[in-house]
Each structure stands twice: as C-alpha cells, then as structure tokens.
A protein has these predicted regions:
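TPR alpha-solenoid repeat register
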Residues: 76, 110-111, 118, 153, ...
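Catalytic-site signature of metal-activated, phosphate-bearing donor transferases
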Residues: 1-88, 92
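Alpha-helical repeat scaffolds
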Residues: 94-102, 132-144, 169-176, 214-223, ...
Length: 313
C-alpha cells in the first residue's frame, strides 16, 4: 500500500486491523474537502480475497480479542458486523450492528464514517432478513437523527422501497439522497449514493413515470441520457413518457435531436434499434429516414446477419 502522508511523529495509523489515520495531540486531524485537488479511485477487492477463509478467521479472532478487552467499542462491534456480513451470516451481523449502535455516544461527529457504515449495513442486513417494515424504518429514523447529512441511509431505503414496488417512497428517498449529496459533499459520506447515481436517476425517471409525473420523469431521463446516450432504460422510459402524454412521433424526434447527434451514425442506430424493439413503427420509419442511403444499407445488412445467427464482422 502506498501512503500519501508526510512522515511526522504525530501522524500515525492505529488499529490492529481496519487501521485508520490519527494525529496525536489536542488539535487532532483537520478534515477538508480536497477532492478537486486530489482523488483516489478504489477499484475494490478481488473476489478471491473476499473468499479467503483464513483471512476471515484471522480478522474475526482479532476483533473478538479486542472486544473481550473493550466490549463497548462501537467501532469494533461494527467491524464484527462487517466480518459476519461478508461471510453471509446476516443474523450475527445484525446482532453485532445493533450492539454497536447501542454503544455509540449520544452525539456523533459530522464525519464519523464508521458509524455511518454501521447504520447503513444494519439497514441492509435488516432488509435482507425481511425484518418488519416498521422496524427498518425505525432504524432509518434513528440513523438520520444521528447523522443527518449522510445520503446513504436515504439511498439504501430508496433501493429497498423500489424492490418492494413502493415507488412513491422510493422516489422520495432517492431525491433526498441526491439533495444531501449535492448539499453536503462526499467527504467521509455518500459512498453508496455516489456509486449508484445513474441507477438512482434511472429509477427516478421510471418511478415518476409510474406515478404520472411526466415532467419530472423527462427531466431525470434527460440527465441520464446527457451522460450516456446508450442508456436504453432511460431512453425507453423517456419515449414511454411521451407516448403516455400523447406526444406525436415528430415531436419525439425533434426533442431527441437535442440530446442525440443526428449526424452521428452511432446515435441514429441506437434510436432506430430502440424504436424497433418497442414496436413503434412511426418512430422506426422516422429514424430510418434520417439514415443516409449507405448507412441504411449497412444497417439492414447487419440486422439480416444478426437474425441469421452468423457472427457480425
């Protein structure tokens, strides 16, 4: 591991495992948002490392030894929950997280990432264990009271409501998560929200469509498509919004021209293939019409090859 810190005696890592940086002395660490100056990309852990049983047992033994000496250590109770959760032991993880929450101080620091992880993971394992909705919502309420600037609580709840088909609640949670992320930033918070932004906007678009709020649905879909023209889910939702609002094919093509480049063959093919998949003959006819003759021939040949099962060149 490369450590990007000055070698000074008051700046040290502490902890037998899950070590973290501390500054000794009364002043402590001064945190700042320097993400515009320096950012790190964590690519995650290899699957083999996650499945390493010997490492799991070593970590578990170290954590249990620390907790034997300090049973009310909320950080290590949280680590205990993480360790059980990574091994698929959700009930043991839930119990450890609940003990961690009970051992937390009344007031948490605004950048207390470990406590944020504990609450977030408690929400997730409780959802996996199909705990009663009222109990999960009570955990969420307590988490927000302790760490009101953390968007991950709202994000995790939004994802849960979405899976349950409770679209109004899901939209509310996702919008709240994004608002917090934009307001309070990502220093020691918002790791899940940040990683799920595109998925959240896709769900917001489709959720608002299901709720009949087409104006918001269109806005969310446009945000996604301006980032990625190939996002078929957002494009399908957008076209469905127009269809349900009785927008003509001509107006749809005109609107999509603000997002897609009609001089770019790749953009034109994306739109044509989606129109064909939706069975929208009117849009298919119009998107075929903006292809140049040679592009149309190449597209038809490629589609014929694909339908025959032969490999595309």
């Amino acid at each position: 591991m490369i450590r990007f810190f000055v070698n000074r005696p008051d700046l040290r890592y502490v902890g037998k495992i899950h070590e973290h940086l501390v500054r000794k002395g009364r002043s402590g660490l001064h945190l700042t948002d320097a993400t515009k100056q320096l950012a790190f990309l964590h690519t995650g852990y290899q699957e083999q490392e996650k499945k390493d049983k010997s490492k799991f047992e070593r970590n578990l033994n170290i954590i249990l030894e620390i907790l034997k000496q300090d049973p009310e250590n909320c950080d290590y109770l949280g680590y205990l929950g993480d360790t059980y959760s990574s091994d698929g032991k959700n009930e043991e993880a839930r119990d450890a997280y609940k003990k961690a929450v009970a051992a937390m101080p009344e007031k948490l620091g605004v950048y207390d990432q470990r406590s944020s992880y504990t609450y977030t993971n408690l929400l997730r394992v409780s959802q996996c264990l199909n705990e009663p909705e009222a109990e999960v919502e009570a955990i969420y309420k307590e988490a927000v009271e302790k760490l009101p600037k953390e968007p991950d609580f709202d994000c995790v709840m939004g994802e849960w409501y979405w899976r349950k088909g409770q679209y109004e609640k899901a939209v509310q949670m996702y919008e709240l998560a994004i608002a917090k992320l934009e307001t309070y930033g990502t220093v020691n918070r918002g790791i899940i929200t940040t990683s799920m932004l595109i998925q959240m906007y896709e769900c917001l678009g489709e959720g608002c469509r299901k709720l009949g709020d087409y104006q918001k649905a269109v806005r969310y879909c446009v945000i996604v498509l301006n980032t990625d023209h190939k996002d078929v889910d957002a494009l399908l939702t957008l076209i469905n919004c127009f269809a349900e609002s009785n927008v003509s094919a001509e107006e749809v093509v005109q609107f999509l021209g603000k997002i897609y480049d009609y001089s770019d063959i790749k953009d034109k093919v994306i739109l044509l293939r989606v129109a064909m998949a939706m069975g929208r003959k009117d849009l298919e006819r119009m998107f075929r019409g903006i292809l140049l003759p040679q592009e149309r021939e190449e597209f038809d040949a490629a589609m014929e090859t694909a339908q025959s099962g032969a490999p595309l060149s």
